[in-house]
């Protein structure tokens, strides 16, 4: 399968500014590639990472635009984006995985990551620790009265500082070596609906209308 890809010269930032990739980025756009022979998916290499403060997410730029073309039958293809397995080692995730790049999209391929730990929550807890600590100081309580409490406050503050550092650090580097996710291109077979007059025309099945866990857990049949 041959797919058209264009290495962009410029990319648009969240601020609306348009920057020159060659001048602004440390690495130039890199074509997706298979990591090993026989791999189903190609790895994607990011060239720039932005933090979207409003939505508390990281956006990775690839500097690539695609025309993913048609399948052998002339039907449109679709590109699926999937997280890499090493993402399970962190608290980050791709919120819309598997993501879909439709046949007609000609813009830059962007990858989004969020952290399961809200940055706002970390800030709130850290602020609470500071408030309690300041209250203790203003009340002029002796250390003998608040020894254990003070130690616990310090432990909480240290924990929150470490968590905030992790939350603020993007999951992948943009050094031309880190791979942020993977892609695969499939045929998006066209669907046409055949409406029937009664539910019986759908036919019978062992599961029937059992859903949301109702259809599992039964004894296996011999």
What is each stretch, according to the model?
Residues 1-222:
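DUTPase catalytic domain/fold
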């Amino acid at each position: 399968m041959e797919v058209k890809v264009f290495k962009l010269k410029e990319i648009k930032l969240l601020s609306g500014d348009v920057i020159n990739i060659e001048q602004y980025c440390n690495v130039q756009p890199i074509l997706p590639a298979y990591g090993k022979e026989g791999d189903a998916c190609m790895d994607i290499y990011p060239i720039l990472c932005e933090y979207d403060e409003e939505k508390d997410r990281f956006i990775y730029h690839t500097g690539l635009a695609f025309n993913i073309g048609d399948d052998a039958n002339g039907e449109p293809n679709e590109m699926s984006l999937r997280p890499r397995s090493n993402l399970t080692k962190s608290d980050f995730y791709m919120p819309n995985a598997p993501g879909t790049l439709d046949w007609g999209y000609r813009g830059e391929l962007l990858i989004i990551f969020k952290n399961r730990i809200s940055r706002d929550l970390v800030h709130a807890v850290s602020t609470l620790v500071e408030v309690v600590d300041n209250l203790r100081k203003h009340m002029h309580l002796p250390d003998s009265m608040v020894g254990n409490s003070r130690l616990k406050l310090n432990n909480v503050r240290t924990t929150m500082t470490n968590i905030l550092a992790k939350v603020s650090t993007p999951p992948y580097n943009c050094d031309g070596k880190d791979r942020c996710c993977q892609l695969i291109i499939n045929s998006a077979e066209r669907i046409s609906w055949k409406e029937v007059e009664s539910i019986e025309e759908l036919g019978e099945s062992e599961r029937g209308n059992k859903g949301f866990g109702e259809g599992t857990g039964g004894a296996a049949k011999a």
